[in-house]
Each structure stands twice: as structure tokens, then as C-alpha cells.
């Protein structure tokens, strides 16, 4: 089909694919500026955050797609990165991947995703396997990197800090404060806690934050009201099992603060099966704000991690590292902030 025919087809379908020239003209900036934003080197040239956001928004609006094949042939680079996740299912990893994809595709990068399913041998083997595919960098999502690698590495929620790895982390103290102060205002004093799985990088950091904030605001943590998600099981099942254990202990509680939304949804299911009404008798708070949190019955009160933002920051940071020959990389973790989402799974404690 000729170019003229392609334009006509685009108008007919309503899909217009803009190139670098069209983007630059639309924004009133140079093609060089647009290119530097899209290939992740904006900060090297001190391009303002406002301009970066305008370029990314316009690229999405105008359906810009970088010609990755042509670029890679010219530069003799793979234009690919690797992404390691614990598992691919609804929730944390999927949301982070969405943010990573937003940035990489606009920048003309392709990515390989591998799921280690918490198997230590796969955690060790996957970095080498990905490097054998000529990836230029690696993003590890809730996955500990056990050795230094010869390529740039960005970690999302890996609290085992390594000098050569840039970490994207949530402010867990602020997250714990949001949840516990909310329950405290609702006069909850007997709070049950469902901790994360032993393999999760966030488990210890989040629990330490909870203990610190609880001590500050005068909430006493009863050890018999603390349980932990089992390392096996998928979806809501670990949360269901943890809540069954809490009920079997026979210790009264008026609220549950769960490690994640899937655990909280599992807890609500078990409470309902036991004839306990949420939130009239027991309030439940989750963590993450996954898609099903808002559609659950009742809609879940939760601490929202900006998961897609964390993915976008991770991908943007990795691209900057790939393009930065001087290795002038951040020396400290990049911290993102949570927000609190109050829905219908919490209410005042029954005195």
C-alpha cells in the first residue's frame, strides 16, 4: 500500500500513528528533545520534568511507536531489558509490569519477563539466562539479586541493598501510619495482623514500620493476634488460611490489617463464612489497591501503593543507567509515597 493509501486507511480506522517529526511539531520542541525523552536520557541533558511529561503524554495520545528494529540495527544494540517477577498473577507484579511496559514501549525497548515462583535455583539462574539473550539491563520486582551483575540493575521493593543496584521503595512508615491511625480513629484496639510471606522483600520492612507506628500511637500488638501468610498457595488462599488460624486461637479482635489486598479479600471471605459481618463486627484493611479491591464486597479499605508509578520509575531509571556511561547513578533508594483509600470494609469498633 502506498503512503497515501496508508494515510487514508488511518483516517478511516481513526488510528493515527505519529513519528518523531510529528511529535516534535505537535509539541513545538525539537526532534532531538523528543528523542532524548523517549530513549530515557532526558536527565543527562537537563530536560525539565514538565517537558518529559508532555512528551510522554503526547506520545501516548498520538499513538507513537518507536521503530525499534531500525534503531537496533543502526546502533548494534539489543534494545531489550529483562524483568524478573515472583509470579504473574493479579496484583502486585501485574500492576508494576504495566508501568514498566508504559515506559519501555514508548522508548522503543522490548522486554523479557521471567517468573521464578520463589524457587532459589531460578533466582540464581535467570540473570545469566537473560544476559545470554543480550539484555542491556535488568529490573527485579520483589526479587533479591544475589550477586553483582555487569549490566545496570534496578530493583522494585528489594530491601537487601547492594551498591550497584538502585532500589525503588515505598515509604512503609507512612503506609503503616495511614492504616493504623485510621483504625485508631475508629477506636480499634484489638487488631489482628497478617504478615507477608517469608520470601517477600517487603515483609520485614513493613512489619518493622507497623511495630514502630503502633508503639508511637499507643496500639498494643498482641502476639497471639499476629499470623503470617504461608509461602505456598496462590491468590486469596494464603489469606484465607491465615484468618482461619486467627479464628481458631479464640482471641477476640475487631480489625484485621493484612499484608496485601489478596490476603484481605481472603480474610473477608473466611469471616463471612464464619458468620462474622464486615465491617459491622470486624473491619479489614488491605495493602496495594489492586483492581479487585474496589469491586470486592464490601469494597476494600486499603493502602495504595503506586505500583504502576513504581514500574514507570524503575523503567525510566534503568534507561538512564543504560545511557549513562559515567555511571553517575543515584546512591540511595528512590522512595515513592503511598496514599490511603477508605472504602466500606472499615467502620467504628463495637464497644
Which positions does each model-derived feature cover?
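N-terminal helix-turn-helix DNA-binding module of bacterial transcription factors
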Residues: 1-77
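Alpha-helical recognition/docking segments in bacterial nutrient-uptake
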Residues: 1-15, 19, 76-181, 185, ...
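Glycine-centered short loops/turns at secondary-structure junctions
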Residues: 28, 107-108, 187, 218, ...
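Hinge/beta->alpha junction and helix N-cap segments in small-molecule ligand-binding domains
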Residues: 86-95, 114-122, 168-178, 194-244, ...
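Generic beta-sheet signal
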Residues: 141, 156-158, 170, 194, ...
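Short acidic capping loops at alpha-helix termini that bridge into adjacent secondary structure
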Residues: 190, 221-225, 277-284
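Flexible loop/turn connectors
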Residues: 242-351
